[in-house]
Amino acid sequence: MSVSALSPTRLPGSLSGLLQVAALLGLLLLLLKAAQLYLHRQWLLRALQQFPCPPFHWLLGHSREFQNDQELERIQKWVEKFPGACPWWLSGNKARLLVYDPDYLKVILGRSDPKAPRNYKLMTPWIGYGLLLLDGQTWFQHRRMLTPAFHYDILKPYVGLMVDSVQIMLDRWEQLISQDSSLEIFQHVSLMTLDTIMKCAFSYQGSVQLDRNSHSYIQAINDLNNLVFYRARNVFHQSDFLYRLSPEGRLFHRACQLAHEHTDRVIQQRKAQLQQEGELEKVRRKRRLDFLDVLLFAKMENGSSLSDQDLRAEVDTFMFEGHDTTASGVSWIFYALATHPEHQHRCREEIQGLLGDGASITWEHLDQMPYTTMCIKEALRLYPPVPSVTRQLSKPVTFPDGRSLPKGVILFLSIYGLHYNPKVWQNPEVFDPFRFAPDSAYHSHAFLPFSGGARNCIGKQFAMRELKVAVALTLVRFELLPDPTRIPIPIARVVLKSKNGIHLRLRKLH
């Protein structure tokens, strides 16, 4: 009698055979993956061979040199040692070219290469595909659609709203300060810049500085800054599935929820306002619309309105970009002036001479403070709010010095490295506002606090106006002094932050 193929006596042998086949397939896949990684490493070595760099570990790359938030310090050292650009190996088969030469940056920013998708995709659950992350024709359409929201006619009335937000912050400071005590200012400045963007761009009535719910949004943005930065540098967190299972992934998901709840509330409130009698007609009579109204009334080239997903992505993007980068700029400018009292005093004299006894400030005043503007620009050079951007070459490039790169290489455009490049700026660590005197000359791409080229910051003029208003009104009311016991340590995140906060002592004037 024959024995069935499914009988118990045959099962162990069949199972053993299946396991052997599975093990063989697994080994084959591992070998194929290893070969793929090896070939990619060899391609990178050939692609970057014209650019010297420090020795790196075959598996870990330069990662050991960038531990404990030493990225900015390490970049400064490489800028001094390796002219123009330097390969940065994140691991044995993953590298990007660190670029900090103005001629190189002029070439790259003058092209239409996309942002490096792997780097920026980590931000998509947070801000979606808005202007920051879009590429190609869709980016061009959105940019053209939003540009009217930043016309001078729109920006002029915003000065009064900026003044209101800054004065609320300064009133709060008067209540908090005591003799010789210091204040961590970044949180306060973040609320002020969020207040400003809400009033100016989103038609918000009231002040988020007086609303406790806004504090959770600020904390969520701070958490997202840190989480995106650390995830980009953790090889085990590149998988979305594995990241969602980790404690960091769960915190990221919760922070995204908090940020989205805030922006959804803003959109729904404005939509509700537009349903009120007379409000829609009032908006239609405006010569130019503010940011949110541009989005709500927008028509794409095919005649369709923005989808809810696209609308929220643009609001999330501008809510973050419009307040967090400016908060970084204002806070570091205050610190720079606090540590250079002679320049702070001269700025105050200029502002007092302009405003007289009153503290009101107008659009016209903002172009009549040359020395204060010089100090603001020098602080932005030392502390660029966005320390870097990335690009992935869509075609080969040859730089002015003859060195070239093939298609596919990822470039890390270090604004921070550029601003500390001693071949571009003499004594780059010295605070010297006269670098930006009206008669001074410097390379067109030597100073890029708002990036450059077609993808420069769309809100550049808005941000500069806000910086000037904040500095002018603050210096009229307070003397800024450093806290020698808590010197801020700049660290690279999506936005330039301080590892230990920015603490200043404030002395009320008059």
UniProtKB/Swiss-Prot annotation:
Gene3D superfamilies: Cytochrome P450 (1.10.630.10). It is found in: Endoplasmic reticulum membrane; Microsome membrane. One of its GO terms (molecular function) is iron ion binding. Its EC number is 1.14.14.1. The chain crosses the membrane at residues 11-31. Belongs to the cytochrome P450 family. This is Cytochrome P450 4A4. It comes from Oryctolagus cuniculus. The gene is CYP4A4.
